[in-house]
């Protein structure tokens, strides 16, 4: 799974599942879940020649593979289309009228397709369309919608920006998502998420779609391990005028992970470029640890990648390692 496959999967996959669980009646509800208290950050990790490849792998997977950003897709939940399609579905549902003549309500508990339930509340300005300030909330209780996943926990959505036609694929949509004790179980694996995320999707200039995600703190639990991303800012640009789809990713964040024994700061200096399911063929990002030591990861094309390791923090590489994305990702798995 690479950039093109995952994008901002956790939230948009959730949106598509919400639509399925709501039975098409509509979506809704104020975001009124409990406050999120992220764990304090630890010290920046010490980067050495021996641990640099694993650190590079953990950072790389946040951007291009089984990332924190998309962790709810790693249990097999499908991402719908180009990522923006699931949000488009929500727009269409809203355009089709949530509950005619009703601007605020708590719907009767909805049965999910296979088992479990979902409670839906909403407070909207105009039930006939989506508009600024609309609020939706979903509380899932072991909801199995028939896609093989079971969802529990809360998801609140507030529309913070919208422009376009709800009946078309060309729109600008900005959402604030709040996840509380949100879990997805599939094939015996459970992933959880908690935090607040801001998302914007701009598909007004087809065939290009721009997706931006930001969060001050967001925690994911998977395989019994919790990781937190702080100060996340990521922009993904997809161009479907070519096949496979051309994807560009620009990002910065701080990651706190028990796999690292500390924190790392990650930022792209040149946007990562890829086609379809391939690894990035161009771009670079730098991982900074304690005492300004760093690892710069440079895409060389195909499966090739270079690690420039600055051990003393003087801005010049002390060690250069030419390796592969496959090996870098294997290092992350072993961390």
For the regions a language model picked out, list residue spans one by one:
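C-terminal motif of bacterial Sec signal peptides marking the signal peptidase cleavage site
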Residues: 17-20
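Bacterial N-terminal signal peptides that target proteins for export
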Residues: 1-10
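Low-complexity, intrinsically disordered segments exposed to solvent
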Residues: 27-335
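Bacterial signal peptide processing site
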Residues: 22-26
């Amino acid at each position: 799974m690479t950039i093109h496959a995952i994008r901002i999967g956790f939230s948009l996959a959730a949106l598509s599942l919400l639509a399925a669980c709501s039975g098409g009646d509509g979506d809704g509800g104020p975001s009124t879940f409990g406050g999120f208290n992220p764990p304090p950050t630890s010290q920046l990790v010490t980067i050495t020649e021996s641990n640099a490849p694993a650190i590079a792998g953990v950072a790389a997977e946040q951007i291009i593979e089984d990332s924190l950003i998309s962790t709810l897709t790693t249990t097999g939940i499908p991402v719908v289309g180009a990522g923006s399609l699931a949000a488009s579905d929500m727009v269409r549902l809203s355009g089709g009228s949530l509950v005619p003549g009703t601007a605020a309500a708590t719907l009767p508990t909805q049965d999910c397709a296979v088992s479990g339930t979902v409670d839906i509340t909403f407070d909207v300005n105009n039930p006939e369309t989506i508009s600024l300030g609309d609020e939706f909330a979903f509380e899932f209780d072991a909801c199995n919608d028939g896609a093989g996943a079971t969802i529990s926990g809360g998801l609140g959505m507030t529309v913070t920006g919208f422009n376009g036609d709800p009946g078309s694929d060309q729109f600008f949509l900005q959402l604030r998502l709040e996840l509380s004790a949100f879990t997805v179980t599939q094939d015996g694996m459970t992933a959880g998420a908690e935090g607040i995320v801001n998302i914007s999707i701009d598909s007004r200039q087809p065939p290009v779609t721009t997706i931006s995600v930001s969060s001050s703190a967001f925690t994911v639990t998977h395989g019994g391990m919790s990781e937190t991303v702080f100060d996340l800012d990521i922009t993904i640009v997809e161009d479907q005028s070519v096949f496979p789809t051309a994807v560009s990713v620009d990002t910065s964040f701080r990651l706190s992970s028990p796999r690292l024994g500390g924190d790392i700061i990650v930022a792209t200096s040149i946007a990562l470029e890829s086609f379809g399911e391939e690894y990035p063929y161009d771009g670079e990002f730098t991982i900074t640890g304690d005492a300004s030591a760093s690892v710069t990861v440079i895409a060389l094309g195909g499966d090739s990648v270079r690690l420039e390791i600055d051990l003393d923090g003087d801005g010049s590489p002390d060690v250069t390692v030419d390796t592969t994305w496959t090996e870098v990702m294997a290092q992350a798995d072993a961390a």
